Structure formats: structure tokens, C-alpha cells
């Protein structure tokens, strides 16, 4: 069972949490997340903190990059840690259903959730709260990257298509597809963030 490991590091490079992802898309447990409590338990060590401190530590340990980002600059929040690896000053959520409302109070936070029904619904909520979100629809309208990719993928031997994303659902997919097509559209992602409610159509 080969898995990729993404570490959540403190400024002193100590591991406070990590997530593993199965390299095979057919594994039932594709993502496994280890918060700081589980790390200590697996090593048979005691985490000497109060119950209140433990709650805070567990939350921080599953917010990937939270202790590394500079909140004086633009911070991009993603649904997953892997996406956050591809953009500087980013945070990745390790659990899809976690609330992020407390981050809406931070003026430098913007959101790039997944290009699917759930991700778009979450971003619509953020837009209503006046937060910057990524306009997937506008991005594809301008770049035609999704159409170019469909055409490129159809030219790939059917037996080899499983190696490639079926759709562009997140930043990880987007970067891979841009690489395959030798397209420089990823250099211009920042202009597709907006907090205007008039741009809801382009989500």
C-alpha cells in the first residue's frame, strides 16, 4: 500500500500532524489524517496538556501550514493539504466538513475550494460573506483549459487514461493538466479571485 505523506510543520520544523494519501485511486481509505493526539498515541507517549489545550492543538495540527503562513499577506485556503503545497502562503484543510467561519474575520484570507458541487456551494457562502473566492467558471471561460484537456485526453490510448485526471477538480489537477498541455495559465490565477457578488455567475 504505497502512500504519499504530507507533513504539517511548526516553524521549528517539528511535525504537528500529517496526512497520507493512497497512490492508488481504488483504495477505500484514500486519505488518512493524523492529528497531534494520534501521533502521540501511536508512539505510546503522553501529551501533557489540559483538555482545553488538547482541543486547540488537535485543531491546529489538522490545519496544514497554519503555523507557517504570514497573515499580513494574502493567504489562500484550500480543501486539502496537497493543493496548499502548490501555492505559497497557503493553508490546507484536512477534513472536508470542518467549519472555516472563524477565518472569514481575517481580511487577508481568500478561498480556492474544489471545482465540484460541494466546493462551489462553500465558496458561494464565502462570497455572500464578502470573502474572495476563486472563479473556476471564469477561469475556464478565459483559458479553455478544460476543453483543451478533453481533446488532449481523447488522443491518449484508452488503456493509459487512468493515469490522468478525468476532470480538473482542484489546484493539483489544474497544475498537472497545465503541465501536460504546456499551458502557462497557472501564472495568472490571482486575477480570478473576486469578492464581488456580481461575479457569482462565474463561479
Regions found by a protein language model. Name each.
Residues 1-107, 113, 122-123:
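Phosphate-handling DNA/RNA-contact segment within nucleic-acid enzymes
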Residues 16, 71-75, 81-203:
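TOPRIM fold recognition
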